[in-house]
Amino acid sequence: MKKMKKMKNKKLKILLSAPRGFCAGVERAIEIVEKSIQKYGVPVYVRHEIVHNKYVVDDLKNKGAIFVEELEEIKDKSRPVIFSAHGVPKKIPEDAKNYNMTYVDATCPLVSKVHREAENLSKAGYHIVLIGHQNHPEVIGTMGQLPLSSIDLIQNEDEAKKYINKNNKKIAFVTQTTLSIDDTKNIIKILKEKFPDIKEPLKEDICYATTNRQMAVKNIAKNCDIFFIIGSRNSSNSVRLVEVAKKSGCKNALLLNSLSKIPYEKIANSNTIGISSGASAPEILVKNFINELKKRFTISIDEVETIKEDVVFKIPKKLN
């Protein structure tokens, strides 16, 4: 009790990064699941986690969604299935049609844009290089838009340096939407030096929300003794935010996915802490974290907004 009282006397400044949390693609995907439940009743099936956040997935499970990894797992094929925000290989909607299943595609429109780019460039005679992380569902979905012989994956600078254009075709690159901006720039620089004629997207593929959240974290990281990113371990954009905070001047940056894992001793040795959240993390998780801190410290909060966001994506007409 004395220790708690002593901590309560400790003053702590919170720099709250903005924008943070849900992006338009995530909000759209969650709304698609909720509207599908309203329209079709329960259960509705969702192929893969709709977004990479346990809180969101558990909430939708409670509302009547059942999550599977493959269509074969769905015993009652008369029930609708929703494809996650990360996108799916082209084969998946075809399989759903063969099963006579009703499906709703919750792929983020910005991921769908990358799919179209890859397809159009391939049709125009280009061999495609995808910059991204192997086994991430978005990467699996993008690579699945084309025959495997038409697309290669590059994950880092080392792979970019070693990459050989075996097809002797003209090449073009596209990227995963949730990458580190700075790391991706370095990979692109290497590819452009090796292949001066490489074709790039008309507009960069890293999405507005990824860019804005990384800029916002970068803006305040150097002023923080410790930085917390609220998000799940399998959330690519959340993990990238931790990396950005570390590279931008706050070596003590951590991913927090559970209130039971708050490192109070580390916080007690800090004066200023930064807080942001990944694009799939709901704001309630940030509020819950701050409320836990209020129980133990005397805190002041300064929200630092780097850029305003007003992007909204429409849901499919069939759900209106």
Residue ranges and their predicted role:
Residues K2-I273, S277, E283-N320:
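The feature marks the mature, well-folded catalytic cores of soluble enzymes
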